[in-house]
Amino acid sequence: MTPDSLLNDDWTRTIERLGGAEALASSARDTQAFAWGRKVRTPIVLLRLVLAYCLGEWGLRSTTAWATAIGLVDISNVALLYRLRRCGDWLALLVGHLLAMKAPTQSHGRLIRILDATSVPKADRAAKRGNGLWRIHSAFDLPSERFGQFVLTDEHESEQLDRIPVVRGEIRLADRVHLQPDRIASVLRDGGDIVVRAGWKNVRWQRQNGEAFDLLDALRNAVDGRIDQPVWIARKHGPALELRLIAIRKSDAAAAESRRKARRQAQKDGYQISQQTLAAADWFILVTSLTAAEFSAADVLGLYRLRWRVELGFKRLKSVIGLHGPPGTDERSARPYILAHLLMLLLLEPSVDALEDSPHWAYAA
């Protein structure tokens, strides 16, 4: 964001996209972001000031100097910080408003929703020593290539498959950290389907009768390097969950690379890698609730390959919008800082494709 973009016609259009001046004033008062107008005269001025600080990377002093120079408002850097800390709920409401305006669309009757998370470091030294993070949990929707949901937490909140509300009929794609049986059951109960990557020892594999299912033995005996069969996974709360196991043997080159990465990770973490892990590295393993009658194994594998699109979504957030670790150590200021970047991403999404050299989803593999 540049100073000009806060002053020209783009700013007027931004206000309109956020519901107009009257709606912004109402939401600012409802969330107590704006209570009086002695210095900062209107919520519109407050929003302009907060976005200039969060997106302009000027710092508090430079932002207030800029605001004074253009005749926007004359306040101290301390006063700006105070107002910023009151804006978290307001900015969250505005992000929600933009998300609601573009409710997910369907693709061939089904919404494809990719779950993932990204993080930015906390600013203070103690947090950095303790790997302190702000974590942004997201749902990235296809074919619209838009973020459909955001949830902001710190490093104490882990990635969870059901953290983002389910849109009935969606197909939820997620990596192996989301192989969480009880949370998978929650998504299915709310009307979604799942395609989740699996590791050989992430869960307790079972047969229909409750006996243990030896996944590695099944991989060893797979015909033509493929598996497509029912499987059950044990749950902590409730009966075992029936899913569909799909596995395909990797190419020699891909398998060798996977084994190399597994050995390197074991060396880094200081443990002896098992032969079972090396054997499983030769395979790409998924579980899904999609039926074979509706989706072939090739269809399911093709769906999962779409996960690379969310990486481009996070690229937009960090390179195009410029999100990095927020300054300061206080959650009350870090939260609005991150929300301001999410707000700007949503405002720019209709035109952001023109800024990138990546192909559109419709032309992707």
Which residues are covered by each model-predicted region?
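Single, function-defining residue in the core of a domain
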Residues: 1-57, 65, 74-75, 79-87, ...
